[in-house]
Each structure stands twice: as structure tokens, then as C-alpha cells.
């Protein structure tokens, strides 16, 4: 998953790997709190394209907030919020 996040954020070096791994873990927990089934999210290499995009968007939001621009961070946040909302209402992604 780390390689997918780095590709989405256009990062080609390893300086931020620890921070990105923490963000990936936080993204998974945030999706689980929203009701997204952890069987879908708790994988070192998820294959579901919607889950991958949501995790990348979450990481982009928080990473850009610290290391980038507020404009890019807000764009990632908007994307993540929409993805999380849709996933939390989809019956094949939720725990309820």
C-alpha cells in the first residue's frame, strides 16, 4: 500500500515512509470507524480500487496539510470525505 500512496502523492524517495505508513494505518482506522468492514481495509496490499483511492486521498489530505499546500490538502479532504461517505453507505462495504 505504501508504494501506491507514494505514487499517488508523486513521492519517489523514502524520507517520509514512516509518516506515510502511519497515515495509511490511520486511514484504515478512520474507514473502520465510519462502518467500513475491516476485512476490506485491513490488508497490507488491498486490491479493492475504491478502498485504495480512499486511503490515498486520506494520506494526501494529511500529508499536504503538513508538507504541501492548503489548496491541495483541501482537495484531497473533499475527495476523501466523499469516498468515505459513499463507502459507509454501501451494503457490500459495511459491517451493518
What are these regions (language model features)?
Residues 30-38:
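Protein-protein interaction and targeting regions used for scaffolding, dimerization, and localization
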Residues 8-12, 34, 62, 66:
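Alpha-helix C-capping/helix-to-loop hinge sites
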Residues 21-31:
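Amphipathic, heptad-repeat alpha-helical segments
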Residues 11, 15, 41-45:
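Surface-exposed ligand/attachment interfaces on beta-rich extracellular proteins
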Residues 1-14, 95-96:
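Short, intrinsically disordered N-terminal pre-domain segments
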Residues 16, 22, 46-96:
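Short loop/turn elements at secondary-structure junctions
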Amino acid at each position: 500500500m505504501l508504494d501506491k500512496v507514494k505514487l499517488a502523492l508523486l513521492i519517489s524517495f523514502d524520507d517520509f515512509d514512516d509518516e506515510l505508513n502511519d497515515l495509511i494505518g490511520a486511514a484504515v482506522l478512520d474507514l473502520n470507524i465510519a462502518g467500513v468492514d475491516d476485512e476490506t481495509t485491513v490488508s497490507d496490499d488491498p486490491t479493492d480500487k475504491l478502498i485504495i483511492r480512499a486511503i490515498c486521498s486520506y494520506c494526501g489530505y494529511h500529508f499536504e496539510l503538513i508538507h504541501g499546500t492548503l489548496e491541495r490538502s483541501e482537495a484531497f479532504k473533499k475527495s476523501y470525505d466523499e469516498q468515505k461517505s459513499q463507502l459507509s453507505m454501501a451494503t457490500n462495504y459495511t459491517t451493518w
